[in-house]
C-alpha cells in the first residue's frame, strides 16, 4: 500500500536536502537583475537568464558595502547559498557577494556617482573659477613623500621664484584618505593668504586613485572658495575630482604651470617692452616740446618783447585815468554829503530848535495879544447890547412909559386866546394894580 506525504513533510525533506547538499552551500551564479526596486533595508529581486528565474535576497549589511547600486537589467556574478522557503515551497539564493559581470564594481560606482552629480549640476562650466594670473602663495593637498610635491616646487621655483608653496600633508589612498583630502581642502579655504589650491597624486590603479572619486572629495572641491587645479594620476586617468575642479592637469608639472601662467621671463619681457614704450613715449613728448619751444622762440613776441606788454601799458593808462576820475567823483560826492549832513546837524541842534521856538513864541504872543483885544472889545459891545435888551424887557420901565401889563395867575397874558369869560386877571400899572374879571373876549380881525 502506497504512503502519501503531506506537503509540509515533502517541503521539509527538500529543505533538509538543500541545507545538507555541499554543492548548494556555496553557489557561483551569473544572471541578469530583474524586478529590482531599491528598498531601505534588505533587497529582494530575481536573477534570470534566457530559460529560468531564481529569487534572490541581499541582506542590508552586505548591500551597503557594495559601493554601487543594482539596476534593472544589470548582469552580475554572485556567490551565495540556496535555501528553501517552507511557507511558499519556493527556493531562492541568499547572496553574500556581488560583482558586475564584465565591468568592475568601482567602474559602475564611478558612473553612477558621476550621473548623480551631473544631474545636480556640479560639473557645469558656469561654476568654474578663473585661475589667478599672479599667485603669492599656493596650497598643495598631496602626500608629503611623493614626487608630486617635488615636481610642483621645482616647476614653480623655475617659472616664478618667490611664490610660496604651502603643503597640506595628506593620505591620498586607502582607508580614510577621502575624508582627509576633504578635510585639508576645507582647512586651506579657511586661510586668507592663499590664492590657489592644487590637489593630486601620482599614477596608479583605479583602486589607488579611488579616494579622488569619493563624493565627499568632489563636494569639497565644488564648495572651495579657492580655485582648484586637479592633478590625479597620469593623462589617461580620469577621476570625478577632474570633472569638478576648475582646471585639470595631466601631471604635477602641468599643474604647476597652470598655477603660474605668467613666468619670470614673461614679466621681464613685459617690463622691457614697457620700458621701450615709455622711452619712445618720452622721446616723442620731448621732440614735440622742443619743436614747440623752437616755434615760440621764433615768434614775434620773443623777437620784439616790448610788443608783449604794449597792450598792457595802454590798459594801465586807461585804468589810471578811470581811477583818477573815480576818485574825484567820490571826493565831490563825499563833500556834498558832508555839507548836507552838517546842515541837517545844524537844523537838528537844540540851540537852533530853542531859538526857532522862541521866535515862534514871540509871534504867537503878539498874535494872542491882538486877538485878545479884539475879543475883549467884541465882548464888551455884546454885553452892552444885551444889557440894553434886558432893560427893554424890564416891566417897571414898560409901565413907567404909560403901558399896563395883564397877568393871569402870575403869567403875562400876551393874547386874548389865553383868556375866557369870568377869568380873574391882574392889571399892572405904573402906580399899582387892579383886579379884574373878564366880561367878554373878542378876537381882533386880521
From Swiss-Prot:
Gene Ontology CC, one term: cytoplasm
Keyword Cytoplasm: yes
The protein's enzyme class: hydrolase
Catalytically driven reaction(s): Exonucleolytic cleavage in either 5'- to 3'- or 3'- to 5'-direction to yield nucleoside 5'-phosphates
Keyword Cytoplasm: yes
Name of a matching Pfam family: tRNA_anti_2
A biological process from GO: DNA catabolic process
Subcellular location: Cytoplasm
InterPro entries according to UniProt: Exonuc_VII_L, Exonuc_VII_lsu_C, OB-fold_nuc-bd_dom
Top-level taxon of origin: Bacteria
Primary residence: cytoplasm
GO molecular function: exodeoxyribonuclease VII activity; nucleic acid binding
Function according to Swiss-Prot or TrEMBL: Bidirectionally degrades single-stranded DNA into large acid-insoluble oligonucleotides, which are then degraded further into small acid-soluble oligonucleotides.
HAMAP family referenced in this protein's UniProt entry, alphabetically: Exonuc_7_L
Subunit organization: Heterooligomer composed of large and small subunits.
PANTHER family cross-referenced by the UniProt entry: EXODEOXYRIBONUCLEASE 7 LARGE SUBUNIT (PTHR30008:SF0)
Name of the protein described by the UniProt record: Exodeoxyribonuclease 7 large subunit
Originating species: Streptococcus pneumoniae serotype 2 (strain D39 / NCTC 7466)
